[in-house]
Amino acid sequence: MLLNVYNRFPVNFVKGEGLTLIDDKGDRYLDFVSGIAVNALGHAHPKMVETIQRQAETLLHVSNLYYNEAQNRAAEKLLAATGYDRVFFCNSGAEANELALKIARKYGKQLSPSKNVILYMKNSFHGRTTGTLAVTGQEKYQADYRPLIPNTVEIEFNDIDMLKAHFNSDVCAIILEPIQGEGGLTS
């Protein structure tokens, strides 16, 4: 029924309350996964439910072709907190990583036509898009999609000497997870 992108666990969650998930048998679980570490907001907090409901009653989705107040407020808060002058909203970590790769390559090209190499770590995971697969250091994800985007180099995680050996004037970026989750919780 669903595309098999994960080995699923035999549990069917039907409800969440705070840090607790409840399955279809009524068993309760502490949610230590948090949406694969992307949702630390808990489940069904009354203020969150109220905010989502209020937004859904106003505008559920508007293309980025147009302005809308909720997006403007979120952008202002992000800019104030970071000190940056621009923000780009994405739907996923893969999209954010795609943008980072594009920014790095564009900036590198401005400095030198050959400054387009991206170093990434073995056992890393950065997404399932074409660009992020090229910097995801796991053969099981890459194999079916070769040839991948060129000029990416895999480095052993935590091997500083290997990193130094491959870091040269052609490198425009290094993408890494401080703690590898998909790669086996390596730090």
Mark where each language-model region is.
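Short, acidic, Ser/Thr-enriched surface-loop or helix-capping motifs
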Residues: 23-24
